[in-house]
Design a protein with these regions (language model features):
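Nucleic-acid substrate recognition interfaces
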Residues: 1-352
Length: 352
């Protein structure tokens, strides 16, 4: 938070003191939530501003409550809070809550805090668990992986999500019939929602006070968005598991300029649907757990235009050319597979 009068950064602790001693006197509704939950929101705001000052993120945007997923932060105040059983969970204030899905939360774990969120008509819980270093990594999972192999290069793209230098190819899940069918339904429900808004405007109603029919239609749209998102996330996790279970010595990927790619209005939607940044973040995290080094090659490295055999750079190669034909030595190969081989053998990189 920024103080306009003193022109300096105000920490979460200082702002919390201001809320307790001054702001809370005029705004009694602040007492409706717990002090630790309020402090957590201030800490999150402080973290967002620090990332902005360190050039790690853009300036924090104001997030209107009605446009955000409902999230409730519950600290552990008593010994019995956040006790985990196989089929239920002790949530502070809400008491025992049954779980729809089993096996995701560690039974008997020491929970520090948790957050309950409401997204598209469903409740989700995420918890912070205190674990020791010995059990930090899943040893049973690590031993199930194969012995270490040579390094691999991965070329990410739109036609296929990932092409690996060992010959594996992972398709674009957004081209599957299931996702296309859901996107078609989403467009139809969005048009229906838009018509309801337009109808209310013609009748002179206030859009801010939406009707019950509009709220029901919004929930349908939210559920479709959530379903498509879950399909993409599940596919990403499966792709990453298939890549790291071979346990290569290193994984080389290109440092993609996703923000620049989004400026192309013809490719922006397809690039956004591929979720490259999310995929790379998960890959780095999983590789760190297994002990695999991730190499990041500069985004200006011509991996697709370089011949893997003779090293000639084919400057006339277009995005529509799906087969790489070297004008010097005649080497012919799929352009994405050729790029993955060049990434694998790249000499200049940085360790992620």
């Amino acid at each position: 938070m920024l103080d306009n009068h003193q022109k300096h950064f105000v920490s979460a602790n200082d702002f919390d003191k201001y809320v307790n001693h001054k702001l809370k006197l005029n705004l009694p509704w602040i007492n409706e939530c717990g002090s630790k939950a309020r402090k957590k929101a201030l800490v999150n705001a402080e973290t967002a501003f620090k990332k902005f000052f360190d050039d790690l993120a853009s300036f924090p945007r104001f997030k209107k409550k009605s446009y955000q997923a409902v999230k409730l932060y519950f600290p552990k105040n008593n010994k019995g809070d956040w006790t985990i059983w196989r089929h239920k969970l002790m949530v502070p204030t809400l008491k025992q809550v049954r779980l729809k899905e089993f096996g995701y939360l560690p039974v008997g774990a020491v929970v520090i805090s948790g957050t309950v969120s409401y997204v598209a008509g469903r409740f989700y819980v995420s918890i912070v668990v205190d674990i020791d270093e010995k059990s930090k990594h899943n040893k049973d999972l690590e031993t199930s992986y194969r012995t270490a192999t040579d390094g691999i290069g991965i070329d990410l793209g739109i036609k296929d999500l990932a092409v690996v230098s060992d010959g594996r190819k992972f398709k674009n899940i957004n081209k599957s019939s299931k996702v296309k069918r859901l996107e078609k339904r989403l467009r139809r429900e969005q048009r229906c929602l838009s018509r309801k808004y337009e109808s209310k405007k013609k009748k002179g109603g206030k859009i801010a006070t939406a009707s019950a029919n509009i709220e029901k239609q919004k929930l349908k749209v939210q559920k479709l968005h959530q379903r498509i998102k879950q399909i993409r996330e599940d596919y990403e996790n499966k792709v990453i598991h298939e890549i790291v279970k071979q346990k290569p010595r290193f994984i080389t990927v290109e440092d993609l300029n996703v923000k620049g790619m989004m400026k192309n209005r013809h490719l922006a939607k397809a690039v956004a649907a591929q979720r490259f940044n999310c995929l790379l973040t998960k890959l780095k995290h999983k590789a760190e757990i297994i002990g695999i080094e991730v190499h990041m090659v500069d985004r200006f490295y011509p991996s697709s235009k370089t011949c893997h055999v003779c090293g000639h750079i084919h400057k006339g190669l277009k995005l529509t050319d799906r087969v790489y034909i070297c004008p010097e030595c005649g080497y012919t190969e799929d352009r994405d597979f050729n790029a993955s081989l060049n990434l694998r053998d790249a000499k200049k990189y940085r360790v992620a």
